[in-house]
């Protein structure tokens, strides 16, 4: 009954946009604990378990009720042997609670916006592969591209001010600001970049919240001016744009830009500018002349410097021709190349050949980057020669083969959209031979002897599994299956790429 009453209080707080009381509710920390337990640094504490977790939450709430000014920023718990060597335990718990609480108004606005627009929850749009069909459709008809790395604010107060437009509750806002500043002072973190790096190992949800709020603020202004309207027509962003005083801020900003950058505003009417972003990297693509995209470059620099107080050098944003330079984006090396074709035409008694060259987007596997990742994970040396994985020899043969198979399957799944599969086959060969060497080292046998015994099984596991899956979708004809297996396939279930060494 008490838990049910707590959820009722949570609903009331949501309706009133008053989040401050939630910081004193135990179920908030229970939500965050369940989410972060598997990947939390709390697991490094030998004295930490579920029972002590509940005791620590109660202790944290009690101390906050007594207004001891965030005792977790002091050396109080350093003297208590119960906490072991994890000196940031309380601040870790509170940061996880903050992340859950601040997400509440954001998620509610997104859900309400989706309901108003009657948008179906399509999880396929979350896949990184969903971007490539758009690139294949647009890039062959465009000429110039500029890849832009979004700079990050140097001062923490900028991030706090951005969050202010999301959080109505002034108490929660000031509490969050105090937490950030005290945390930076305690750990000698002078910039927000250091804070993000520090938190990325402890609370990734809070890191993503800070970064996404900044990027959303930047893109909201960017797209607002791009569309030249008070109403954003892009439904995918609508849920993120309805914020307090948003349109008032934008109208004021438009007046400023109209007075000082009137020439730039005329650029927005051009419909041939395309914008794509993934994480911190964005791409601007245009047609005809580089003048248009060059104006956009200076517009972005002025936007960052005037609105976010972020220094960015225009000289470091390069504009290149798509036909002459490859683009490193989303783990692929993409470029536009001519695809020549010859058509035999016959008119009456005359027959002749017609050369027809079309532009096509090539997506290649970045072999150098993947070899460096494999070498870092100790699957091969820096030259790409397979080596054994000594840290795995204590596992069973089945677990060793299963680990290598999962990594090979993940890489094959992600890079099935490659135009050429030769580099992908090379990576799979390295993993297969590294697996054999690991087993040989475990059994103190030679690679040749072990490879003869396991060769057929490994070949079947590593190289025929993809064909077995495709055979369930397409007719079992060798010609059709061979064409499908060599062609491009973009999967819409890929949210992120797992780390090679920690793939589970």
Curated annotation (Swiss-Prot):
Its main location: plastid. GO terms for cellular component: chloroplast. One of its GO terms (biological process) is RNA splicing. It is found in: Plastid, Chloroplast. Disulfide bonds: none annotated. Keywords: Chloroplast, mRNA processing, Plastid, RNA-binding, tRNA processing. InterPro entries: Domain_X, Maturase_MatK, Maturase_MatK_N. Usually encoded in the trnK tRNA gene intron. Probably assists in splicing its own and other chloroplast group II introns. Belongs to the intron maturase 2 family. MatK subfamily. HAMAP family: MatK. This is Maturase K. It comes from Cucumis sativus (Cucumber). The gene is matK.
């Amino acid at each position: 009954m008490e838990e049910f009453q707590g959820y009722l209080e949570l609903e009331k707080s949501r309706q009133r946009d008053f989040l401050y009381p939630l910081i004193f509710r135990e179920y908030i920390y229970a939500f965050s604990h369940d989410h972060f337990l598997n990947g939390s640094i709390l697991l490094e504490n030998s004295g930490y378990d579920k029972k002590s977790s509940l005791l620590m939450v109660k202790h944290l709430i009690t101390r906050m009720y007594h207004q001891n000014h965030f005792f977790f920023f002091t050396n109080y718990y350093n003297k208590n042997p119960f906490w072991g060597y994890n000196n940031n335990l309380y601040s870790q718990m509170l940061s996880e609670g903050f992340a859950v609480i601040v997400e509440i108004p954001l998620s509610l606005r997104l859900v309400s916006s989706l309901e108003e627009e009657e948008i179906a929850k399509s999880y396929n749009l979350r896949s990184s592969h969903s971007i490539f069909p758009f690139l294949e459709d647009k890039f062959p008809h465009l000429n110039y591209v500029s890849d832009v790395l979004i700079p990050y604010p140097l001062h923490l107060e900028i991030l706090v001010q951005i969050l202010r437009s999301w959080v109505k509750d002034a108490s929660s806002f000031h509490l969050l600001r105090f937490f950030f500043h005290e945390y930076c002072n305690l750990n000698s973190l002078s910039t927000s970049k250091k804070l993000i790096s520090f938190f990325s190992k402890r609370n990734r949800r809070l890191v993503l919240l800070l970064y996404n709020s900044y990027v959303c603020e930047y893109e909201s202004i960017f797209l607002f001016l791009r569309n030249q309207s008070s109403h954003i027509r892009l439904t995918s962003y609508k849920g993120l744009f309805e914020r307090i005083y948003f349109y008032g801020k934008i109208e004021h900003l438009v007046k400023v830009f109209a007075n000082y950058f009137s020439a730039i505003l005329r650029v927005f009417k051009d419909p041939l500018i395309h914008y794509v972003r993934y994480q911190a990297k964005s791409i601007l693509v245009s047609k005809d002349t580089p003048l248009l995209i060059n104006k956009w470059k200076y517009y972005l620099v002025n936007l960052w410097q005037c609105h976010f107080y972020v220094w960015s050098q225009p000289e470091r944003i390069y504009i290149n021709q798509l036909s002459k330079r490859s683009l490193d984006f989303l783990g692929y090396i993409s470029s536009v190349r001519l695809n020549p074709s010859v058509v035999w035409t016959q008119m009456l008694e005359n027959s002749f050949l017609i050369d027809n060259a079309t532009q096509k987007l090539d997506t290649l596997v970045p072999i150098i980057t993947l070899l460096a990742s494999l070498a870092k994970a100790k699957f091969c040396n820096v030259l790409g020669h397979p080596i054994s994985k000594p840290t795995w020899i204590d596992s069973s043969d089945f677990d060793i083969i299963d680990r290598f198979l999962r990594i090979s399957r993940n890489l094959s799944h992600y890079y099935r959209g490659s135009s050429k599969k030769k580099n992908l086959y090379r990576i799979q060969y390295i993993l297969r031979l590294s697996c054999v060497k690991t087993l040989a080292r475990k059994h103190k046998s030679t690679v040749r002897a072990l490879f003869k015994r396991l060769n057929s099984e490994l070949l079947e596991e590593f190289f025929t599994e993809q064909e077995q899956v495709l055979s369930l979708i397409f007719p079992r004809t060798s010609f059709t299956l061979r064409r499908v297996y060599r062609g491009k396939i973009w999967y819409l279930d890929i949210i992120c790429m797992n780390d090679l060494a920690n793939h589970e």
